[in-house]
Swiss-Prot record:
<feature type="binding site">
    <location>
        <position position="200"/>
    </location>
    <ligand>
        <name>Cu cation A1</name>
    </ligand>
</feature>
<keyword id="KW-1133">Transmembrane helix</keyword>
<dbReference type="Pfam" id="PF02790">
    <property type="entry name" value="COX2_TM"/>
</dbReference>
<dbReference type="InterPro" id="IPR014222">
    <property type="entry name" value="Cyt_c_oxidase_su2"/>
</dbReference>
<dbReference type="GO" id="GO:0005507">
    <property type="term" value="F:copper ion binding"/>
</dbReference>
<dbReference type="InterPro" id="IPR001505">
    <property type="entry name" value="Copper_CuA"/>
</dbReference>
<keyword id="KW-0460">Magnesium</keyword>
<dbReference type="InterPro" id="IPR034210">
    <property type="entry name" value="CcO_II_C"/>
</dbReference>
<keyword id="KW-1278">Translocase</keyword>
<feature type="binding site">
    <location>
        <position position="198"/>
    </location>
    <ligand>
        <name>Mg(2+)</name>
    </ligand>
</feature>
<feature type="binding site">
    <location>
        <position position="196"/>
    </location>
    <ligand>
        <name>Cu cation A2</name>
    </ligand>
</feature>
<dbReference type="GO" id="GO:0004129">
    <property type="term" value="F:cytochrome-c oxidase activity"/>
</dbReference>
<keyword id="KW-0496">Mitochondrion</keyword>
<feature type="binding site">
    <location>
        <position position="161"/>
    </location>
    <ligand>
        <name>Cu cation A1</name>
    </ligand>
</feature>
<dbReference type="InterPro" id="IPR011759">
    <property type="entry name" value="Cyt_c_oxidase_su2_TM_dom"/>
</dbReference>
<keyword id="KW-0186">Copper</keyword>
<dbReference type="InterPro" id="IPR045187">
    <property type="entry name" value="CcO_II"/>
</dbReference>
Length: 227
């Protein structure tokens, strides 16, 4: 999860988030190089008197500044498309969880189990236990098995919401009347926090998400106790 004064991304805990972090660094380096070149050219224009007032055309220069940006865009687009298709792929998920957004809480239904569903509300600051995180703790966590593909089906009962868990690289819009799909795989156990990431009304800031990733045996014990 995030910590005070953090400047970078949250630690990746899924293959998708690792790819997104690498893509961020790749794109940031390209942007940095372009910005440096532009600032260098501007500084030369302001500090020197070298001008070409008689130049009517320069086909070589025009060719370069047409081809070079095209190459740069391709270098950004190809890894971006690769990650996009990776996020969309899911073959034979171990588990499917239906997530519904409400004003202002989340409800979850484990479709592979009979009558396994619950609502997840934020715990008020006055009710937090020692060590609890303000505005991030919930009364019912989403317990999922680690290292197994899980399909999340996301929708909304009322207005637009967005189900987001940054450390897993997830952000899926919850749209009334529409079912969106997200895939998640956690590479290690732990608690992963997120929040609604679409302004949805007065209590938008009070819709936290908590995923508890556990080993498969522990997950099966939890489902047995819940059903």
């Amino acid at each position: 999860m995030a910590y005070p004064m953090q400047l970078g991304l949250q630690d990746a805990t899924s293959p998708i988030m690792e790819e997104l972090t690498d893509f961020h660094d790749h794109t940031l380096m390209i942007v940095f190089l372009i910005s440096t070149l532009v600032l260098y050219i501007i500084s030369l224009m302001l500090t020197t008197k070298l001008t070409h007032t008689n130049t009517m055309d320069a086909q070589e220069v025009e060719t370069v500044w047409t081809i070079l940006p095209a190459i740069i865009l391709i270098m950004i687009a190809l890894p971006s498309l690769r990650i996009l298709y990776m996020m969309d792929e899911i073959n034979d998920p171990y588990l499917t969880v239906k997530t519904m957004g409400h004003q202002w809480y989340w409800s979850y239904e484990y479709t592979d189990y009979e009558d396994l569903m619950f609502d997840s509300y934020m715990i008020a600051t006055s009710d937090l236990k020692p060590g609890g995180l303000r505005l991030l703790e919930v009364d019912n966590r989403v317990v999922l098995p680690m290292e197994l593909p899980v399909r999340m089906l996301v929708s909304s009962e009322d207005v637009l919401h967005s189900w987001a868990v940054p450390s897993l690289g997830l952000k899926t819009d919850a749209i009334p009347g529409r079912l969106n799909q997200a895939t998640l795989i956690s590479s290690r156990p732990g608690l992963y926090y997120g929040q609604c990431s679409e302004i949805c009304g007065a209590n938008h800031s009070f819709m936290p998400i908590v995923l508890e990733m556990v080993p498969l045996k522990q997950f099966e014990s939890w489902t047995s106790s819940m059903t």
